[in-house]
């Protein structure tokens, strides 16, 4: 009879629970700060829902009521220059990160009103969610696309799971550029089952990237319970099979989340990343708007009431009372101050017509229709002063005969010598003395550490490339066959093409995507396609297709200088 041998994963997976001693040892000032931030989120979201009912929110209102501790506890450990992103439900994460960036180190909410910077953060986020021009993205992003680079908010994404590879890319850039920092991708139980999530986690583990994959497991993807979506509902269980740590915590307990986040940062500092945190929490309301899930019949009022009995704000109040840190008078004072900040923001964003008490948006706050195309492409100012020459500008004795593939290798190697931010990513780029087409031959000889092999995960590593570009690298990503662009189509179309436009412009997206087109090679229809039309469908891309070595050198040099994403379509018949 065959012998059965139990196998164990190479990485741990565990749950962190807080104790009474943990609460006693926590700093009183920290607990009060975290409590006030949870209260701010609650009042902020209530105001957004009021405005949504009044027809004043231009777009959805994905409220985070019930999930306040999951956000505040996570942000309590992060620094301003640590990077975060999120999904469609990110008001609570973004608001906390913004407030932390503006809160003085000695601020005491029981003694002081909000500073001007704190007020401005509340106001500008509310404006953005309402689609108004004083928002962080000029109203372009709205509720689901929020960004403020100065506060470490790299951008939220409405494509479920689309943001997760980006965070791995931020971390990759930090690692290559020798910057200290943590990147965090926030997402829910729904995105945890996306293929892009698995791909990003695997790449992050492969390169030990300093990134935390933070899952707010609120049990529901719109109306679908996690039990209806996966047999293994414990999301952090996925980590050990990829070789990194998974931590589970009580997402309704502010201190439990803080400790899990602190533990994750310690692991990254001492052992390398990534880490997954699964914060088990609950969204009190429906997917969007102010109704409950039970109003739509996909869960019961009894279930909702059971979770509300563990309200994170009420739990914190009970602990603060038990510890003698605060009582009803202090809670009232905190509530008054955060409510005043929210109310002040709302008053700046609305008005009433003469003789009416119906709120409306002042005309001056609507974005200008003339700005609708801003950010689709850059203005090309990065080419100011650049010299462009055609082959006719050279004498015959100034030119050298060269194969197309050799020119490709040479131009990349020379560019990498001049620019330390250029990296190469793709499948097999580190083998065959230059990858499958010889493109990386010189790069491997000169800068082998900047040529990064990727698994067969085009959508995942294309998303990583986008994150890396947003954090200061100029990545060159290779798609081995043009047909594989359709595997990466989400990141090509919804990610790279739209990222600058949906956040209101103002930053570069320096990506070069090399695409090999290989007809007439006998590989059949799935390896012979030309995807140029795919890029043409999405105007955030520039597309070039050189046919000789001279044009390749010039166009690749331009692509590597461009602040727009450039697709370089290479027909192997010219190699």
Please describe what each predicted stretch is.
Residues 1-70, 76, 285-287, 291-447:
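Conserved acidic/glycine
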Residues 109-114, 118-134, 205-215, 451-453, ...:
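A glycine-rich helix N-cap at a beta->alpha junction
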Residues 64, 72-79, 96-105, 435-447, ...:
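Glycine-rich loop at the start of a catalytic domain that most often binds anionic cofactors/ligands
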Residues 46-49, 54-207, 225-231, 236-243, ...:
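Cofactor-binding active-site loop characterized by glycine-rich and histidine/acidic residues
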Residues 152-343, 351, 536-575:
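Glycine-rich ThDP/TPP pyrophosphate-binding loop and its adjacent helix/strand module
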């Amino acid at each position: 009879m065959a012998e059965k041998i139990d196998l164990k994963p190479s990485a741990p997976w565990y749950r962190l629970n807080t104790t009474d001693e943990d609460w006693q040892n926590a700093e009183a000032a920290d607990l009060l700060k975290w409590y006030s931030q949870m209260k701010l989120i609650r009042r902020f979201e209530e105001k957004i829902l009021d405005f949504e009912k009044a027809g004043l929110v231009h777009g959805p209102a994905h409220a985070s009521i019930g999930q306040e501790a999951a956000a505040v506890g996570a942000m309590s450990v992060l620094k301003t220059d640590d990077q975060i992103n999120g999904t469609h439900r990110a008001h609570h994460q973004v608001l906390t990160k913004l407030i932390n960036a503006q809160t003085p180190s000695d601020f005491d909410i029981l003694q002081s009103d909000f500073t001007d910077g704190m007020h401005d953060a509340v106001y500008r986020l509310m404006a953005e969610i309402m689609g108004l021009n004083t928002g962080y993205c000029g109203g372009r992003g709205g509720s689901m696309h929020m960004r403020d680079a100065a506060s470490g908010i790299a951008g939220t994404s409405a494509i479920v799971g689309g943001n997760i590879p980006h965070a791995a890319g931020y971390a990759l850039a930090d690692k290559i550029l020798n910057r200290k920092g943590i990147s965090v991708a926030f997402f829910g139980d729904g995105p945890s089952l996306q293929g892009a999530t698995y791909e990003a986690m695997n790449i992050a583990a492969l390169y030990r990237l300093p990134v935390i994959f933070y899952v707010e497991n609120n049990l529901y993807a719109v109306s679908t319970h996690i039990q209806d979506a996966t047999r293994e509902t414990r999301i952090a269980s996925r980590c050990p099979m990829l070789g990194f740590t998974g931590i589970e915590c009580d997402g309704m307990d502010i201190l439990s989340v803080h400790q899990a986040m602190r533990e994750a940062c310690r692991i990254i500092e001492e052992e390398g990343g990534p880490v997954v945190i699964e914060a088990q929490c609950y969204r009190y309301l429906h997917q969007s708007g102010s109704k409950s899930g039970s109003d739509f019949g996909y869960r019961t009022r009894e279930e909702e009431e059971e979770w509300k009995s563990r309200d994170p704000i009420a739990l914190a109040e009970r602990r603060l009372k038990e510890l003698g840190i605060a009582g009803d008078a202090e809670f009232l004072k905190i509530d008054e101050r955060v409510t005043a900040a929210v109310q002040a923001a709302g008053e700046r964003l609305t008005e009433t017509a003469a003789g009416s008490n119906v709120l409306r948006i002042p005309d001056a706050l609507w974005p200008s229709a003339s700005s609708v195309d801003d950010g689709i492409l850059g203005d090309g100012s990065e080419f100011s002063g650049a010299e462009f020459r055609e082959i006719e500008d050279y004498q015959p004795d100034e030119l050298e005969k060269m194969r197309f593939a050799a020119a490709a290798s040479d131009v990349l190697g020379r560019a990498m010598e001049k620019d330390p931010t250029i990296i190469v990513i793709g499948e097999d780029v580190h083998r065959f003395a230059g990858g499958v087409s010889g493109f990386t031959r010189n790069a491997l000889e000169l800068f082998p550490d900047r040529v990064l092999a990727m698994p067969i995960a085009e959508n995942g590593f294309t998303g990583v490339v986008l994150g890396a570009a947003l954090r200061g690298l100029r990545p060159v990503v290779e798609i081995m066959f043009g047909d594989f662009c359709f595997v990466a189509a989400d990141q090509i179309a919804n990610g790279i093409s739209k990222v600058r436009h949906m956040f209101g412009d103002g930053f570069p997206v320096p990506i070069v995507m090399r695409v090999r087109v290989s007809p007439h090679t006998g590989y059949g229809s799935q390896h012979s396609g030309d995807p140029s039309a795919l890029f043409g469908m999405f105007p955030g891309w520039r597309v070039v297709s050189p046919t000789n070595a001279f044009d390749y050198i010039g166009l690749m040099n331009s692509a590597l200088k461009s602040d727009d994403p450039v697709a370089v379509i290479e027909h192997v018949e010219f190699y």
